[in-house]
Swiss-Prot record:
Signal peptide as annotated in the record: 1-21
GO function terms (MF aspect): structural constituent of egg chorion
Pfam families attached to this UniProt entry: Chorion_1 (PF01723)
Keyword Signal listed: yes
Role description: This protein is one of many from the eggshell of the gypsy moth.
Protein's organism: Lymantria dispar
Name by which UniProt lists this protein: Chorion class A protein Ld2/Ld41
Entry's family note: Belongs to the chorion protein family.
Length: 140
């Protein structure tokens, strides 16, 4: 390998390190949900398995319709799972409509300091308790 090729490899390594250092930190590598954790690179939601980049549903946010590279990344229905800590400090305000059809369930402790209020009404016009009717496959 000549010196010019070695220089290009070193520059490429610096560029890759610069790009990935913006997304991850030292804590992300060793944390519970980090690179080596349950949702890391080798986990069911990692790069090569399940819903990862190489999976049938991977790259879903980059295209218009269908599955894979043609998947739509805007509106959908299904389960949303959040694991880990979600620290929120300060005031969070949501203006506009937040349509939720289905059930919202919290599992575990939800610690909040101060006052938490949720006000609104269901105006989806579906006429069913969970929005999709009693024949829906997933009622939680």
């Amino acid at each position: 390998m000549n010196s010019f090729a070695l220089l290009l490899v070193c520059i490429q390594a610096c560029l890759v390190q610069s790009v990935f250092s913006q997304c991850t930190s030292r804590a992300a590598v060793a944390a519970d949900r980090g690179i080596i954790g349950g949702y890391g690179l080798g986990a069911p939601y990692g790069l090569g398995c399940g819903y990862g980049l190489e999976a049938p549903y991977g790259w879903a946010g980059y295209a218009d319709y269908g599955y894979g590279l043609d998947a739509y990344g805007g509106i959908g229905e299904g389960n949303v799972a959040v694991a880990g800590e979600l620290p929120v400090a300060g005031t969070t305000a949501v203006a506009g409509q937040v349509p939720i059809m289905g059930a919202v369930k919290f599992g575990g402790d939800v610690c909040a300091a101060g006052s938490v209020s949720i006000a609104g009404k269901c105006d989806c016009g579906c006429g069913e308790v969970y929005g999709y009717g009693l024949g829906a496959p997933y009622l939680y």
